[in-house]
Amino acid sequence: MEVKTFAFLQIAVFIALGAQIFLAGTDALSDEDELFSVEYCGTNCTKQDTGSWTTCSGNCTCYHEDGKKVGLCLSTEYTDFTKFPKPTSEEIANARPLPKREKTLN
């Protein structure tokens, strides 16, 4: 009896988790007006003997895990496209790539 109850609870949790993952995935796909980007700055940061971390250059920030002595310098940017006006048809047409030109021999 206990085995059947335990198996039933495992199946119920599995179904609930699957539904949650599906709903979270479809919600993330509908957020086309927001963009969060992360770029590696090409350098690492290290924990010094004093407990402080070396600084990253430019717009980069040191991100590290607890207990580790080496971190990554990363640049993060959040863009909310709802703050920008919708482009007009003319602006969209002007932004299209130009067709390839064929090279001519002189």
Curated annotation (Swiss-Prot):
Domain of life: Eukaryota
Disulfide bonds listed in the record: 41-60, 45-62, 56-73
Sites where a glycan is attached: 44, 59
GO molecular function: C-X-C chemokine binding
GO cellular component terms given for this protein: extracellular region
Annotated compartments: Secreted
Signal sequence segment: 1-28
Keyword field: Disulfide bond, Glycoprotein, Secreted, Signal
Function: Salivary chemokine-binding protein which binds to host chemokines CXCL1, CXCL2, CXCL5 and CXCL8.
Identification of the protein by name: Evasin P1132
Organism: Ixodes ricinus
